[in-house]
């Protein structure tokens, strides 16, 4: 396994990587700096088409545009790199965190806890209606689906747990929650995640400096070191979905990571690529109508 620092972004809180197959580019966000980043691995070009107050995650719509999940329950569209109209879909004093589209075009989206209430997990349906899935969540984080589309994964960071639910693709309902992976002894806290073409789970470890691979039964298969501690999320990308991109946090948000020895943490906030013996699956696309 090799690890390469591909973009020196110095994100304060890099998160939410997603591969856009139409554009052949990777998108991710710096939540606290309010920047939407994109990277073209063929040319090496990197830019930030959107800068706003807060942007917590994006999904790719079926028409190729993006849904951008922000703060105070707001969701907007990004078309050709320009942020368009936004709508408030939930009443929340906090920001969104991780988001994921499901096979039918819905979006599961978590909000951070406030001083008076825990975080929540919502399901945004294609017609714009919203259903509360979970309440009282510490920090809602990475999500995914099994290969057969019959199970849904949801990470609760403070509980150090990845949960697994029965999932109904027709209705979007989830039920029968069970603990899939508990990791009290694994370095760091479980953060973002993805599911590969073999059904294995790749879990980023906040303050653990690594990505952990599990098989479909929850057995740990390996740990892959990243040269900075705050590893936030992962996504497979590239034309063949054979590169594992890793977002990180802890930079100063000025857009360029440190140039020193990576082992000292100077690479905090950069985007990395891990060359692992695995391939991903195309991300499901959202198909949500706002407003």
From Swiss-Prot:
Its EC number is 3.1.1.15, 3.1.1.68. GO terms for biological process: arabinose catabolic process; D-xylose metabolic process; L-ascorbic acid biosynthetic process. One of its GO terms (molecular function) is xylono-1,4-lactonase activity. Gene3D superfamilies: TolB, C-terminal domain. Binds 1 divalent metal cation per subunit. Most active with Co(2+), Mg(2+) or Mn(2+). Has weaker activity with Fe(2+), Ni(2+) or Zn(2+). A divalent metal cation binds at residues 15, 141, 191. InterPro entries: 6-blade_b-propeller_TolB-like, SGL, SMP-30. The active site is at residue 191. Keywords: Arabinose catabolism, Carbohydrate metabolism, Cobalt, Hydrolase, Magnesium, Manganese, Metal-binding, Plasmid, Xylose metabolism. Disruption phenotype: Deletion mutant shows restricted growth on L-arabinose but grows on D-xylose as the wild type. It catalyses: L-arabinono-1,4-lactone + H2O = L-arabinonate + H(+); D-xylono-1,4-lactone + H2O = D-xylonate + H(+). Pathway: Carbohydrate degradation. Induction: Transcriptionally up-regulated by both L-arabinose and D-xylose via the pentose-specific regulator XacR. It comes from the Archaea. Its cofactor is a divalent metal cation. Pentonolactonase involved in D-arabinose and D-xylose catabolism. Catalyzes the hydrolysis of both L-arabino-gamma-lactone and D-xylono-gamma-lactone to the corresponding acids. Can also hydrolyze D-galactono-gamma-lactone and D-glucono-delta-lactone. Monomer. Belongs to the SMP-30/CGR1 family. This is Pentonolactonase XacC. It comes from Haloferax volcanii (strain ATCC 29605 / DSM 3757 / JCM 8879 / NBRC 14742 / NCIMB 2012 / VKM B-1768 / DS2). The gene is xacC.
């Amino acid at each position: 396994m090799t690890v390469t620092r591909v973009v020196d972004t110095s994100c304060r809180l890099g998160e939410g990587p997603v591969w856009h197959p139409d554009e052949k580019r990777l998108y991710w966000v710096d939540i606290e700096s309010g920047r939407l980043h994109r990277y073209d691995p063929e040319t090496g070009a990197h830019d930030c088409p959107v800068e706003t107050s807060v942007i917590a995650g994006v999904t790719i719509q079926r028409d190729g545009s993006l849904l951008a999940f922000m703060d105070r329950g707001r969701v907007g569209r990004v078309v050709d790199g320009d942020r368009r109209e936004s709508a408030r879909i939930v009443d929340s004093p906090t920001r969104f965190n991780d988001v994921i589209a499901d096979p039918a075009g819905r979006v599961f989206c978590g909000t951070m806890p406030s001083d008076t209430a825990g975080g929540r997990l919502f399901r945004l349906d294609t017609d714009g209606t919203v259903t509360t899935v979970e309440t009282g969540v510490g920090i809602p984080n990475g999500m995914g689906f099994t290969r057969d589309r019959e199970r849904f994964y949801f990470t609760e960071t403070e509980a150090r747990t990845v949960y697994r639910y029965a999932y109904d693709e027709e209705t979007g309902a989830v039920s029968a929650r069970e603990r899939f992976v508990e990791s009290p002894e694994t370095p760091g806290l479980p953060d973002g995640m993805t599911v590969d073409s073999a059904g294995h789970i790749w879990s980023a470890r906040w303050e653990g400096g690594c990505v952990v691979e599990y098989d479909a039964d929850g057995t740990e298969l390996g740990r892959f070191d990243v040269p900075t501690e705050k590893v936030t999320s992962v996504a497979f990308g590239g034309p063949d979905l054979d590169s594992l991109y890793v977002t990180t946090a802890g930079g100063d948000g000025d857009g360029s990571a440190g140039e020193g020895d990576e082992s000292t943490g100077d690479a905090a906030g950069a985007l990395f690529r891990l060359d692992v013996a695995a391939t991903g699956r195309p991300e499901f696309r959202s198909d949500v109508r706002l407003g």
